[in-house]
Amino acid sequence: MCADTTAETPEYKDTLNLPKTDFPMRAGLPAREPQWLERWEKIGVYDRLREKQGRAPFTLHDGPPYANGHLHIGHALNKTIKDMIVRSHQMMGFDARYVPGWDCHGLPIEWKIEEQYRKKGKSKDDVNVVEFRQECRRFAEGWIDIQREEFKRLGITGNWADPYVTMDYHAEAVIADEFMKFLMNGTLYQGSKPVMWSPIEQTALAEAEVEYHDKESFTIWVKFRAVNSGDLDGAQVVIWTTTPWTIPSNKAVVYGKDIAYGLYEITGTPEECWASVGDKYILADKLADDVMRRARLDPDMYRRVGDVDPSQIGGLTHPLHGAEGGNGEWDDIRDFRAAEFVTDTEGTGFVHCAPSHGMEEFELYRDLGMLEQVITYNVMDDGSFRADLPFFGGKYILSRKGGEGDANKTVIDKLVEVGGLLARGKIKHSYPHSWRSKAPIIYRNTPQWFASVDRPVNDGQDSYGKTIRERALTSIDQLVKFTPQTGRNRLYSMIEARPDWVLSRQRAWGVPLTCFTRKGALPTDADFLLRDPAVNARIFAAFEAEGADCWYAEGAKERFLGNDYKADEWDQVFDVLDVWFDSGSTHAFVLRDREDGTADGIADVYMEGTDQHRGWFHSSLLQACGTLGRAPYRNVVTHGFTLDEKGMKMSKSLGNTIVPDEVVKQYGADILRLWVAQTDYTADQRIGPEILKGVADSYRRLRNTMRFMLGSLSDFTEADRIEDPAEMPPLERWVLSRMAELDEQVRKGYAGFDFQGVYSAVFNFATVDLSAFYFDIRKDVLYCDGDTTRRRAARTVLDLLFHRLTTWLAPILVFTMEEVWLERYPGEGSSVHLVDFPETPASWRNPQNESNVARVRRVRRVVTAALEIQRRDKVIGSSLEAAPVVHVEDAETRALLAQIDIDDLCITSGLTVSADPAPAEAFRLPEIEGVGVVFEMAEGEKCQRCWKILPDVGRHAHAGVCGRCDAALG
């Protein structure tokens, strides 16, 4: 603020209390943030927080990212939300611990090492398994180091010096021990059922390892001839499938009890057609016309002969029945029966059953006790047909690169040759793919190890149910809170409907299934599995000391079995555990076993993306219910996916990816963190260049607010403080009331993980209530008053605001609030992250005062709008040139205005409140009734110090100033 000067008038600028601060308006975050990271490490902020005594523990348990590749924007979102949860709870008085972790075993790393081998012309099979596992370990270690630094650069606090990793020896020992609890409690069994199988990676996959993409598939309509069916003998049941490769494994056809079927006779055919005149087809009536159209048959080329009761059909012959060279492979009669899962919404109204490749068919024949008659083993690990399968031996369902193999075409050609095909086509549909290789998967019956979710768990922990499923569902109902609440239903429905858990993988890099099976025994035999606590204890001790590699060492079987068992009577299992069992066991080796874990092995919060309802939330729940008897968490918090600015999924091919490292280099990590705080993370979020520009603009506005406070508090001391709010003007008491209200909002928001709500409330308060209103009004007092009560009150309020705004925003803007804090408290060990949210007295709340100020602000809006017209028309240059007359109809409002300095609030040199009706020419705002403003110029001279135009300017000891400024000059 400068004053006009003349030769006779002194320069008063140096007498003003102008803000003084070295806090720069330009943040320079990319360059400066690393300095604060170094400082925090030097002064040991995380460890010093752990030294605070008497605090209730709060534990957010980290869902481990995979130790493979640089961070993507989803990682940044995830870890930033976690960091805000941890920091805010620490500042609310908890001992908020955070142990970051990494998931290290599994297919993605194996795949990378195998890729390296392939480039060198080598195969994994050429290398000793322990040597291969060591290469996988080194690969994971390298990426852990890289990702750790990338996470730290985002300002994520935590025990980075001692994270948990699932390949640590202790972790591997506990994972094996948790598995052996399933072995001992009766839920582990070996079974054979269709599982999702990746021919490319040659292993079973969990649902969480599968993603769905559009795929073009062959679709065929195939004829099965009825036999032992009386008048229907020779008629053909038509099935439809999108997996022609499963036809050689067909064992049955099923129909729906409530579907109407008809017999259709072919009366004519076009030139190119696989139907013949006189053929009779059995079809669902609702689908018959569609099937005929697919077979190129016009409506006048077929007729409906009559109804068909499918229960009268005694059996079917396979289309390859009696085929020359078939060696009798398909010559037995195919079963034909009703099934609940058959519909007439698409296809033919019949379903071809290959129970080795479909779960519904498998379960149907399992429940009938007929599995032995219908299970085939035609498809090998690599997705090829067994070598001795007639016509198709050695044919691949998928090529080695994951493309279409030669199996489907070969099957279709053979069906054409034997007259078994009615129609063919292509269909584009959503199809499961391996999330790692991106290649399609198949369903394939293989021997696997399962954890039963419905067998009683014999561990004496039945408070929440006797089975894993019961315990999980009861935990969801009674023990776990969900944010957002929709996550509850999603997880519940998944657990309610899920099959048994496939634990085994046919891979090398993982924790092995540490169990032994008796040679010659069947999986259903009571002594099939060795259940011996002494053997288990030896395994655990060895893994603890040497890691899981010792399972593969020479003589391992003899070592673990000990002297009580003959090694040649037992087989050692070499499958490895599903990696979701690894991460699902973290409650044991992190929460239970670490000093910075939890007393009961249960976390306050698990927080991950919404895909983890079928991933980590899911596997952790199942695993803990099998060993703890209940869920391992009290709160499940879920975030959505990150999309580009147009709401499109990010992909390298579209060129719309946002890389966290690039954002940090351009804007700084605080801008990325602020984006997280501004968004509703519970839904899908959007990010892109324009969105980030908007975030940076919001940041600058907040930074400007903090800079103003720092400048105005440059020489503030305790002697300046006014302790009793009653001694303050109404405007300051209003700010105190708003602070108390906001303190409650902030604490409630942080406790409920509502960062968008916290940020929105604080940002609006800082920019609307403070910068655009309170600061704007009080600049005159702060700059021009002497040692007055109202200036002391304003600075007291600024100090109180400073301590609250910096701490409230510290969990979000970790770097900037540290910079702001150190500007006032630059001590060597000082940090905003070492303090708590200040206690804010509830007595500050004054709803009546808030209501009064709201009324005043409505009047002020009309005055400000009226003056803006005068400024626009160049009648005035500043509002201080005005002294308007404000006509207020409401007597209560007039009385309120009489109690305050309304001209100061409107930033005018004078203002008259009138009870007279407003004249016609008065300015009004339609949304604010009963207030009219008549513009008047201020009378008097311009004070050369405060710039107000007042009648008394020039009548005091100091030349060219008003009475207030004269008193300030002394």
UniProtKB/Swiss-Prot annotation:
GO MF terms held by the record: aminoacyl-tRNA deacylase activity; ATP binding; isoleucine-tRNA ligase activity; tRNA binding; zinc ion binding
Key word Nucleotide-binding present: yes
Cofactors: Zn(2+)
Keywords: Aminoacyl-tRNA synthetase, ATP-binding, Cytoplasm, Ligase, Metal-binding, Nucleotide-binding, Protein biosynthesis, Zinc
Enzyme class: ligase
Gene Ontology cellular-component terms listed: cytosol
Catalytic activity of the protein: tRNA(Ile) + L-isoleucine + ATP = L-isoleucyl-tRNA(Ile) + AMP + diphosphate
Protein residues bound to L-isoleucyl-5'-AMP: 608
Family per record: Belongs to the class-I aminoacyl-tRNA synthetase family. IleS type 1 subfamily.
Domain remarks: IleRS has two distinct active sites: one for aminoacylation and one for editing. The misactivated valine is translocated from the active site to the editing site, which sterically excludes the correctly activated isoleucine. The single editing site contains two valyl binding pockets, one specific for each substrate (Val-AMP or Val-tRNA(Ile)).
Name the UniProt record assigns to this protein: Isoleucine--tRNA ligase
Native organism: Ruegeria pomeroyi (strain ATCC 700808 / DSM 15171 / DSS-3) (Silicibacter pomeroyi)
Name of the gene: ileS
